[in-house]
Amino acid sequence: MKVAVIGCGTIANAQHIPAYCNNKKTEIKYFCDIIRERAEKAVETYGCGTAVTDYREVLADDEITAVSVCTPNKAHSEIAIAALKAGKNVLCEKPAARLYSEALEMQKAQHETGKVLNIGVVNRFNICVNKIKELIEEGALGNVYQVYVSFRSHRSIPGIGGDFTTKAVAGGGVMIDWGVHFFDIVMYCCGDPSTKTVSAEKFSYLGNPIEDYVYTSMWAGPPKKDGICDVEDGITGMIRTDGPVITFNGAWAQNIGENEMFIDFIGTKGGIRLQYGADFTLYSTKNGMLTKTEFDMEKPQMFQTEIDSFVDCIESGKKLPSHIDTNIITAKMMDAIYRSADEHKEIIL
């Protein structure tokens, strides 16, 4: 199966390209990036493919079966929709798009073409996450009535001044970058409950002005001190669903002592704390005593599993849990979070 990677930045080089190279069924024919040097570097590094700068050239090639869209968020919907209409199967990095309306257009194109459109919500391929989903479905926690989500860092604004902190490119800040992963886990494990109301507030203090931002290291750096930082570096709020009430606190940068990256699933019979990217602990009772069970599970290569599953579903026609139809539920909720924060009022859905 011949594939192409559109967008040859950090996530493509760290995950998508190596995963395709490790999959015996796939051959990368094109590396595409508007910055030619990036595409050429990929050809040189991986010893395969052709470097191009226009994704339309990729889509015009009938030999291409599938593409990974790893561009900045602003290009996701345009490229994914064009690829679907050109008869290609698509794995689009998260978030699906900058805006809920764009994600809906992507879903519409998928329904019209019948091609695969999966979103890069990679935690749905995490063994720990799937075990939590299983435990909740089995009733181990009883009624899960509350979920608390924390994705807070002391100093982690990525590439400040660049694409990540430019609203016109990214669509938002920490919520659309980190929050999308955490909320996707919550929705997936809790059976995709419908959102009823959302109340949120967002903050942008530590990244403005850019020249005053103090840090020790920076992912996706170096900083562009003459660039733009017009997105939130912090956000908090509450969501009512027809399942649990979800409260959350997220920040790229916050004056706290330690990073806090976890999700608490709180039920009537038990509770689970998932440390993001690590293991989880189940708190319950048995024989009149409080219990604490630590689950230490195999750490899978989630991106490899994601790519392998994408390739397999193209061949089998099986619908994956990362399909656009499931992701659109989270996209709608996140849209309401931003609307609430922008308008300083509760949003009723």
Predicted features and spans:
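N-terminal Rossmann-like dinucleotide-binding module
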Residues: 1-46
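Active-site loop of classical SDR/Rossmann-like NAD(P)-dependent oxidoreductases
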Residues: 11, 274, 296-308
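Predominantly a Rossmann-like dinucleotide-binding segment in NAD(P)-dependent oxidoreductases
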Residues: 11, 123-226, 344
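Hydrophobic residues in well-ordered beta-strands that form the structural core
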Residues: 12, 92, 117-119, 248, ...
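Conserved SAM-binding strand-loop segment of SAM-dependent methyltransferases
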Residues: 48-55
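Beta-strand-loop-alpha-helix segment that lines the small-molecule cofactor/substrate pocket
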Residues: 65-66, 72-73, 77-124, 139
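C-terminal helix-rich "cap/oligomerization" subdomain common to oxidoreductases
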Residues: 66-69, 112-115, 287, 295, ...
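Contiguous beta-strand/loop segments that form the cofactor/metal-binding neighborhood of enzyme cores
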Residues: 184-279, 307-318
